[in-house]
Amino acid sequence: MFFVLTFIMAFRSVNVGVDTAPYSRIFGIIHHASSFREAIELAPLSAPIYVGICRILGLFSAEPQILIIFTALFINIGLFVFINRVSSNVVISTFCWIGLTLFYCSMNGSRQSMALVITLNALVYFARDLKSKKGWILMLIAIGIHSTCLIIAVAILGIILTDKIHESRLVLIITVIISALISIVFKGIVRVLLQFFPHYSMYGFGGAQYSIFESNGGGRIVILYIFLLAICVLWTIINKKQNESDSFHSKMLPAVVFGAVFGIFNCRNELINRALWFYIGIFITFIPAVIEKCKGLVKWIIDIIIISVLAAYSLLSLLENQNGVIPYALFWQ
């Protein structure tokens, strides 16, 4: 499966993925800059490590396809390293990567997806030891590629919470309350800021077609966030206490709950939906962990529900072409 996903990503046309063409142009700007410093000044992004990667790739080829191939390898290697380290079911995790539409997103926001897979691997180290040098080095690299990964600070605070409180349901309740309060305050701040910067209202209150559910509600993606929150609740029902045999997912409980709750409150904010990729990414191994804890008929029912919901969500994303990956074309066509 690794080779299939990598092939689809690596050899796609520059027109597959909304941000693929813009990043190809940025690659050209960086490549033709006379120095690394000039490249940083000319590139319309604050990502020194990403600029450095483009400069190095430019030594081998001036064609932007080399960047597309490299990011495909980078993302998929990082993804499968993470999955193999903590997932109880590699196949289901891979399905979740596609079902949660992160695979399509990776062909759109490839730079953010690079930061995402690095951050996920950093969290594995943090779950073991918050002082992990490897974890912090990975985070610094992720920040140098896409600074939105800083939103994962909440997950780090969540690890501290689970070190203090071992009752899963209490962790759930505390996280839901804190996440809701943060969301309410955040929405208030956004409303105030939009009074001064009204041209950003399309990001704050949903200007994209796929974010609106029957043109009045909170945004259709809210259904996904509610579904993910239900999975978090199911985890706490199954694991009343922290599961020592699966300490990673026990320590990620506050993170996934925050991602779901914050998403519910801000489902019409396009920028927040994109930033929450870092939390949705944790679900690609969290969901198989929940399924594994279920037994007998319950396990089959949960399997069917999760697979059906994610398959429908993924298909709808493709039909609406939210990430610009349809029609798909190979770069030599």
What label would you give each PLM region?
Residues 119-133:
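Membrane-interface transmembrane helices that cradle and orient dolichyl/undecaprenyl
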Residues 80-100:
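Transmembrane-helix signature of polytopic, membrane-embedded enzymes
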Residues 102, 134-158, 260-264:
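Membrane-interface alpha helices of multi-pass inner-membrane proteins
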Residues 21-29, 36-62:
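Short hydrophobic/aromatic helix or loop-helix immediately within or flanking a transmembrane segment
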Residues 172-178, 295-315:
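Signature aromatic-anchored transmembrane alpha helix within multi-pass, membrane-resident enzymes
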Residues 107-113:
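Short acidic/glycine- and proline-prone juxtamembrane loop motifs at membrane-interface regions
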Residues 21-24, 31, 36, 51, ...:
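Alpha-helical transmembrane segments and terminal signal-anchor/GPI-anchor hydrophobic tails
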Residues 54-58, 67-78, 283:
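Transmembrane alpha-helices of multi-pass, membrane-embedded glycan-processing enzymes
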